[in-house]
């Protein structure tokens, strides 16, 4: 069974309310994301998980599969965890609804990894940080990687004395996250860690490696 994709969506974005319905070339931003996902060679099933009827009504004319969820979720991971209870699946890729430039090639690479890896329970796509200025941008999440495993995620790092010595170990999180279904449901039940609250990144829970 190929992994499915779920795009969590809500209108009450803290930094940019209603962002995912922003019109881009005649389509809502999130519809661009959905169509980018459908360009993948391996993903057949794409769902939008939302609590907002406005999102549902905006996307249904395009043929989107909508799963309505509770409005009590504080992050996309818990929203997707509720949605997967209504779907027969084994592995789920979570795609952010504000990534209209998502590369299908990245999604293909992650999907192939999931299909060939039956030991891991969670995956997170990362990319290189090309220059030191990127390291200090607060607009995206960074992570430290040891032996191909993420051990810490953060937005604002401490100052590094020598960027060249660290750039192979510090990478940017690309917004493609995947889970085994059972693990995702259990993960959503865990309480938020203090660092998760500080960094505003929902996949930092109890030092679980990804």
Question: Model regions: which residues?
Answer:
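Short glycine-enriched, charge-decorated loop/helix-capping segments at active-site entrances
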Residues: 20-24, 67-69, 192-193
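Short phosphate-binding loop-to-helix
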Residues: 47, 53-112
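A short, conserved alpha-helix in the catalytic core of glycosyltransferases
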Residues: 197-210
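Short, high-confidence coil segments that cap the C-terminus of an alpha-helix
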Residues: 43, 89, 117-120
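Conserved core of the sugar-phosphate nucleotidyltransferase
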Residues: 103-193, 207
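Well-ordered alpha-helical segments embedded in enzymatic catalytic cores
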Residues: 29-32, 79, 202
